[in-house]
């Protein structure tokens, strides 16, 4: 027997509420697990850093640092490395992981995504893609940088953003791509945190969709086998989907984004430098 109209209405409203919750709120809760921004100052600015304010394509104001080579003029550096950091803190927290590069005659450009550090806005998948593309373009147009000698270096979620950029055709001047502790799929990581939530995320931003398009740009993937944040199998999968030239380094005792920390000394730093030099000067 059918329910009276006055009894069906609350039930229908409840069903609509549940549907709205699943469609609108759950995806936002899931994606928020990827972002842990703050504006805390983790250490002094690099002594030689130039503070750079720039605007994303959608008008969001962003903050970056340009740190020139410490061994000579910036326009004489081996290359300029554009660093896309992980999903927590801000660029001041990640500076120690790249602070060694200017001493090896590399310029470094770091930047904070929207909502991180002094950058305005709220993090989102589309927003971080916009921010990363905009940062690369800022570097391309600097008068003290060779725009044909750019290296993209992404750690954790930064690697996913870099793959998005490459996959959408932004390749001019990029001579090497380095991904450290990067995940292959947003959905897979989300499911680890909230089972089933991955189905509600936009997988069009996942790196596994674009990794094959990096070629013929040389690609280096590096991942610690003791990484409890992003399992190393993500890099293994990305490597399997990538085309040559490519290289995968797995660190037996490596933790999340610590390959270039002081814990490992110069072991992986030198391998990264050798990779970049090889990419810039390929053997025919």
Swiss-Prot record:
Spell out the subcellular localization from the entry: Membrane
Check the record and name the Pfam families matching this protein. Answer: Hydrolase_4 (PF12146)
Membrane topology type, per the record? Single-pass membrane protein
Q: Does the keyword Iron-sulfur apply?
A: no
Q: Which InterPro entries match?
A: AB_hydrolase_fold (IPR029058), Hydrolase_4 (IPR022742)
Q: Which residues cross the membrane?
A: 12-32
State the superkingdom.
Bacteria
Q: What's in the GO CC field?
A: membrane
The answer, when asked if Transmembrane is one of the entry's keywords, is: yes
Q: Which UniProt keywords apply?
A: Membrane, Transmembrane, Transmembrane helix
Which PANTHER family does this entry report, sorted A to Z? ALPHA/BETA HYDROLASE DOMAIN-CONTAINING PROTEIN, PROTEIN ABHD13
Similarity field: Belongs to the serine esterase family.
Q: What is this protein called?
A: Uncharacterized protein YfhR
What is the scientific name of the source organism?
Escherichia coli (strain K12)
Name the gene behind this protein.
yfhR
